[in-house]
Design a protein with these regions (language model features):
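A small/polar active-site loop signature that marks catalytic segments
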Residues: 192-328
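Active-site SXXK
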Residues: 73, 87-106, 162, 201-203, ...
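Soluble periplasmic/extracytoplasmic beta-strand elements of cell-envelope proteins
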Residues: 64-68, 76-78, 95, 127-131, ...
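Beta-lactamase-like hydrolase cores
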Residues: 21-71, 77-84, 148-153
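Bacterial Sec-dependent N-terminal signal peptides
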Residues: 1-32, 36, 439
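Extracytoplasmic
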Residues: 60-62, 80-82, 88-91, 106-108, ...
Length: 439
């Protein structure tokens, strides 16, 4: 753990983030500021959290809270940590950790273009095959590269069809348990700028390049002996960043279905992906049957996890340097970027917390890592369920983050007098905020 902790400081120093404990001043606390022993400091944090869980908000809503000290490898605080609750977009942490564990940090999302026969002069007497790899970042430059590959081979006319291989996942367009009135993009392995209009845009680019398609567009699977003409790739880091920083739902589902594809079965389903997550849950020492994994983004109302599970995933990541590096790089930084950009500014939590937010109707969550003032690295999960407004949950979560990062000398501020709440436009909504290419 010491090597990982050293890495954590080095990485943050490279980003010029003030992650060191704040300077100590004369204390107003009962405990001495000179006593930064683990026991004394943990007592102070627990006292702060005890005061928060007794707030009136907890009388009209449900709370799940779990804080783990990674430095001492011990549970620091728990309140309702085994309650099954909807995680909202904190589900993306589970998806990300599982993907980094099973796919690796070098994994790439790949979209390929094939021909069924070798080109002859300027005529392709066979068909083109576009094989989707569920790349949510496939855009204009990628599509242009496919057309360029045809032009470089001198192809001016395609006598066959344009075949779309969408066999990486099943034919359902939306996630299991998604609300019918959510405005979410369809889930398909062949995407163009986050939309399912890949074929239309490809045909448009062919016409602009003076290439004629004589056949039709239809679905198929990749024929044996097909010839690879071009492929475009995006790294898992490129996908994880918008998935976690901006809470991009489509990126999360794309990652989820890469896990499903590990089944090696055509038309894999969400159940195939969930089975991969379940295996990691078992490795973390928990019982998969106690949870419901319905999707990768947290949009589904069928997802049920616990703060204990979320913390177990964070602990697993912290114990695996490669996973930890990729994960923490993609998580929002409190008060700096992503969905945490406007939260806890000018407080001890700013720069000292990296966490994933979550918001659904009646649910608000926050899951991630914090650096305590005594130099201990913590991980935590907070789920507020049954909250009337998003602000209620976020105010509470921000107060917890301040409680975890304040020193002995910092007055504890209750959430009912702390206005540090990001505008709802800064937070993820049920509609994914898809990345757009520049013209």
């Amino acid at each position: 753990m010491s090597r990982l902790l050293s890495f954590f400081f080095v990485a943050l120093s490279a980003l010029s983030l003030p992650f060191a404990p704040p300077a100590l001043a004369q204390t107003t606390e009962a405990l001495s500021t000179a006593d930064y022993s683990t026991a004394a400091f943990n007592q102070l944090i627990c006292q702060r959290l005890d005061s928060l869980v007794r707030l009136p908000l907890m009388e009209r809503s449900q709370l799940g809270l779990c804080v783990y000290d990674l430095t001492t490898d011990s549970l620091l605080y728990a309140h309702g940590q085994q309650q099954r609750m909807r995680p909202a977009s904190s589900m993306k942490v589970i998806t990300a950790v599982t993907a980094l564990e099973k796919l690796g940090g070098d994994y790439q999302f790949t979209t390929q273009l094939y021909s069924t026969v070798a080109p002859s002069d300027s005529v392709l007497q066979g068909s083109l095959v576009a094989r989707g790899g569920f790349d949510p970042l496939f855009g204009r430059d990628d599509l242009r590269a496919f057309v360029d590959a045809l032009q470089q081979r001198g192809i001016r006319r395609i006598q066959g069809d344009l075949l779309l291989d969408l066999s990486q996942k099943d034919t359902t367009s939306f996630g299991w348990g998604w609300c019918w009135d959510d405005k979410n993009k369809p889930l398909t392995p062949l995407l163009y700028r986050g939309n399912d209009s890949w074929a239309d845009h490809f045909l448009e680019q062919l016409l602009r390049a003076g290439i004629t398609l004589e056949g039709t567009i239809r679905r198929s699977t990749l024929p044996k002996g097909a010839i690879l003409l071009a492929e475009r790739k995006h790294s898992i880091d490129q996908v994880l960043r918008p998935m976690l920083k901006d809470s991009n739902n489509q990126c999360a589902e794309a990652v989820f279905y890469q896990l499903a594809a590990l089944s090696k079965r055509p038309y894999a389903t969400h159940k195939d992906a969930a089975a991969v997550v379940h295996r990691l849950i078992s490795r973390c020492g928990l019982q998969p049957s106690h949870y419901t994994v319905a999707d990768g983004s947290g949009l589904s109302l069928y997802n049920y996890v616990t703060p204990q599970l979320l913390v177990a995933m964070l602990r697993h990541a912290a114990n695996n340097e490669e996973i930890f590096t990729h994960l923490t790089t993609a998580l929002p930084i409190m008060g700096r970027d992503g969905t945490l950009k406007s939260r806890c500014r000018r407080t001890t939590a700013q720069d000292n917390v990296r966490a994933k937010t979550g918001t659904l109707e009646g649910v608000s969550s926050l899951t991630g890592y914090a650096m305590a003032a005594n130099g201990h690295r913590l991980c935590f999960a907070i789920i507020n369920q049954g909250v009337r407004t998003t602000a209620e949950g976020r105010n509470f979560q921000d107060a917890v983050c301040r409680a975890l990062t304040q020193g002995f000398d910092t007055p504890h501020i209750r959430p009912d007098v702390q206005p540090d709440v990001a505008p709802s436009s800064e937070e993820e909504q049920n509609t994914p905020s898809l990345l757009e290419d520049t013209p």
